[in-house]
Amino acid sequence: GTVFNTVGSDILAILCRQIGIPLYVLTPMIKVDTRPVYGYNRLSPMPFDYGPRLAGAWDMEAKERVDFRGIKLLEIAPEYIRSLITEKGIIPSSAFFHEAMEYARFLEEV
């Protein structure tokens, strides 16, 4: 049930928990990453260089004075998530691991 999402999603998750509003995450099952089960470790949080996107037209001298490094995706722990809404239905975060592994097996058969 762990989710990786854009910057600010972590703050929203904490806020929702604090004020008692359930957090739902929309995601297609195809985005589920089961590689960690097999030993692959994903970097968390994911670093990202925003320079090309934010300062593509800047002159080089101006670009060199600004640090554009940031984080692209942050981890949101399952305890902050009520359920994930997918094409397979609404899945509680506590049940998502089982559904993800089932979906991964389905993809291997296709």
Question: What is each model feature region?
Answer:
Residues 1-109:
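Conserved phosphate- and dinucleotide-binding cores of soluble alpha/beta proteins
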